Amino acid sequence: MVDFLFDEEFVPKSRARTMRRNKQRASGQVRGEDKPFIGWDGEGWTEHVCETPEACENSNGSCKHHYYLFGASTGHYVSGRSLSTAECFEVMLDVKRDHPDALHVAFSFKYDIDMIFKDLPTGAMRYIMKNNRMHWKGFYIEVLPGKWLQVTKDKLTCRIYDLFSFFACSFVKALEKWNVGTASEIAHIKSGKDQRGSFTLDNLETDVVPYWRDELRLLVQLADSLRDILYSAGIRPARWHGPGAVADYLFREYKTKLSMPAYESIPVGVLDAGQYSYAGGRFEAFRIGLYDGPVYSADINSAYPYAMSGLPNLATGTWIHHNGMPEQTTISDVTLGMFHIRYEYAEGPSRDIAYGGMPAASHYRYPKSGTMHFRNRNPGVWIHAPEFRNLLRQLQLGMFSKFDVIEAWVYIDDGTKPFAWILDIYRQRQEWKAAGNPAELAAKLGINSLYGKLAQRIGGKQGVPTWHQLQWAGHITSTCRAMLYDTSWRHFPDLIAYETDGIYSTRPMDELPNGVGTALGQWEVEEYSGVLYLQSGVYWLRDMDGNWKKPKTRGVPQQHMEFDKAMEALVSKKSLKVTQNQFIRFGLADMRRNGNNIWRTWQTNEKEFSFGGDGFGSAGKRLHVAKACKECVQGYGYEETLHTLMLSPKGFPFVDGVHAESAAHYLPWRKLGSQPENSKTAQVLTRWGES
């Protein structure tokens, strides 16, 4: 069986450069820069049976969507009323046979994968979603949506990589950002994409095929530009499935494995603490509504790479276990440590800060839902050293009525920093950026791709992915959360929101760790003239010229979020309702009663954005309750000022008559407690690229 995720050959940088300079190649092999890219894409049409195609909601899936064009930039393609799975596989193998040394790429290929798999029965689809590979009618299929589709038959294999995650934007925006294609060519592609909803059998050859050919031609140019820029920065990924391939190259190039202990050699207690203490980035809205006044943002420059650059070597030090609080010198000197604590804030001003505003810098993960809250008290949680130090500063101020350190794992390192090279890449990127050298994009892509590999949960041959290291990953995110909290907890009345590595507030933050500047880990500050903040992650900023910028959204394209409609919703105190077309992929379809009918169809769905969230019963960290909102009590409308959100009143679950401690981060190969229900769903959808 073919190795699935980590079977690439590693070519050291020195050897790669020598081969390129001397035009040498390994026996029988073609150099990476000499391998041509072949672009792949497909198009579909909807067979409407409804009376109003222009307003088709298709809730029952009666208007079927068909794949009627699939092929490559070489000119090979297959077309027909509704292509079969075998037809699509065969054209892939035909192109591979004719172009054995080419690299095959697509852009945002998830839609195409579902359409290509139309003939696979439900049981087969469930199997391949779980296992990512299977035999079917003489073909051997490997698929990881968002990364690649691979088909093998008669010892001939074609793998199509999905380039989308390299760019994380629409194809048109990628062309514009990377200076690929002329203005008229890009306009033609945009026009074609806008007309996809009106594709029919009748205009396949006259309109669709010419547009499709132009798109593939530009896709090849985009792939060439990506490779040229990566190579110019000394980055030569062995695969082309996204930033993870870049991270894989960098980890191998800088011999990261030498700084990682064997997974089975890590003490069980450290592995347990790592799962309990890990938490992701902190998204949290504190105030929502319209604010007509100065708004300040402060963002950490490359926050995760910064935290990563200071990590210790885990292969040359020792984990030490402490019962109770370690000595102060140990806490001050340690880089990496995890602390098991419980706490509750005291009465008075301290309680006002914690209960009425900013909760402590530690998370609580609910066992059933897997959601994380930042609470004013905690029956038990493991946290990393950066956030623990924040709490110790508050402890010294006498802010707690209860603060217990139950145990700790502290890492004593030898002072070596295996990721110090990140700082060199960041500095080089700054120089390239100042000089207008596009290689800066490769440097940015490289260092920003690293953290994800350390936190990866899916993809390992034997369960544990190659670069998984949760103690490192947990320290990285904790460093970022601690920096946000350290600079802002005293200024809760001014805060609008946390956004992972940034803060929005109505006054400038005057205590920014590392200061303001362009260096790694310093802060970039900006000022705006207003904000409309609807709910966590959904907001509009107004620049200093009085123009509203494009919205920040979650799960809905920007063009569907209209500022005027959001304002109308505020004034009327109603939810903002957004309509969008959604392609129903298998993972989502299989969770619905009429899944077989709606799979591979387009539906019109309405998404609702309520003011501040969903009120009582919401799973959110904070919520808007009019009776508890001082601005509402004072008679201010949503469009008149910012309204303060209250901490969720959600209590802690009980286990054997006592409050349960914060639950562990779920790992498929190492279970502590039960898997949260939302994690089960997310795991299935992630495997099919739908998260």
Residue ranges and their predicted role:
Residues 1-42:
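N-terminal accessory regions of nucleic-acid-interacting proteins
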Residues 25-73, 302:
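Gly/Thr-rich phosphate-binding beta-strand-loop-beta motif of the actin/hexokinase/Hsp70
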Residues 39-41, 160-161, 295-298, 304:
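Short hydrophobic beta-strand that contains or immediately precedes a catalytic carboxylate
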Residues 76-195, 214:
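Conserved DEDDh/DEDDy metal-dependent 3′-5′ exonuclease domain
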Residues 113-122, 171, 301-316, 507-512:
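Short active-site loop/helix that positions an aromatic residue
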Residues 171-257, 484:
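Acidic, Mg2+-coordinating catalytic module of metal-dependent nucleases/exonucleases
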Residues 222, 227-287, 314, 319, ...:
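C-terminal, non-catalytic extensions of nucleic-acid polymerases
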Residues 297, 494-499:
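Short beta-strand
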